[in-house]
Amino acid sequence: MGWFWADGNASAAAPVVPPSHKDLAASGAVPPPSCPMHNKTMDALSAHKPVTPAPEPTPAAAAPSKCPVNHGAKDTLAAAAAAVAPKQPQPENHQPAAASEPSFFSKLNPLNYMFSSISQEPAPNQAIALPTERDPSSIPKGTGDGNWEYPSPQQMYNALLRKGYTDTDITAVESMVAVHNFLNEGAWNEIVEWERRFGKGLMRGWEIMKRGEENAPMMLRRLEAQENDPEPQPTLIRFQGRPKDMTPKAALLQVLGRINSKYATEPPFDRHDWYVSRDENGQKKEVRYVIDFYSAPPEPTGEPVFYLDVRPAVTVTGACERLLRWGGDVWWKASGGEVRERERSK
């Protein structure tokens, strides 16, 4: 997941109908490591052999008539000093060749750690032509200049090749792009729901959540009608894919699954951190959301099934929001709120 680009030099894409999500497949892999550094310092030092001082002559071997000053010591010390003295700075053409080449990470977009520019040209020896149209997302940029765009199938394929996935099935790329776009749209819809409930503060969030999750949509609509104040829309500042970093919640679920098979679940196949701009009482605030992507057994018709666990990161405010939403729902049910609601409606 996470293949957004917002470069202006990319081909513009008109709004199009989202592609079909049937018979979709997604996969993830780990990009290859960056180029190794070249270390020539030790080779340069090892070219000089250490100078072994000459053994001092014993008194018996010394001629009594010879001058006591060793006239050869001067030459020996000079040679030793030349061997260990630091060399003068070399011209710049002696710099390691790797220093003149851009590093792997310098080629990535700092907003999302993806390639900042991906060609729309077919790859060498590409047997099948791929579409170059890019679909716009419904996710507004934090910069305020429109929405994020999804990569075209050709860009996705080129990016996979640049990351080292040379065995990618080119016939599955369009389905991969459709799955990617579908999941990111679902993740953003979940974030918007969190922002609608807690974007104006914890007290308002509690008013919405105090009657459980089932009544929250009704409470939210009632509050919005009373306030008659348009809700500021959140925007996505940046995001980061972190497939190797398991979240604490996902790790806890894995531990519970080892204790009791009832809680056993496959680990998430991907993790994202999305940084969202929240308008809180006229002040811009950056809020981090954590997203775990889970796959599930396919539908009987063969369609793939995915689960997204979207929630605020465990900060002071984020932890309170999670407690109010999930804890409030548990309390409403455990305290008999559902029963009281049914009795009142009779």
UniProtKB/Swiss-Prot annotation:
Record bears the keyword Cytoplasm: no
> Which EC class heads this enzyme's classification?
lyase
Q: Which InterPro entries match?
A: Holocyt_c/c1_synthase
Q: List the disulfide bonds.
A: none
Cellular localization per UniProt = Mitochondrion inner membrane
Q: Which family does it belong to?
A: Belongs to the cytochrome c-type heme lyase family.
Q: What is this protein called?
A: Holocytochrome-c synthase
Write down the species: Neurospora crassa (strain ATCC 24698 / 74-OR23-1A / CBS 708.71 / DSM 1257 / FGSC 987)
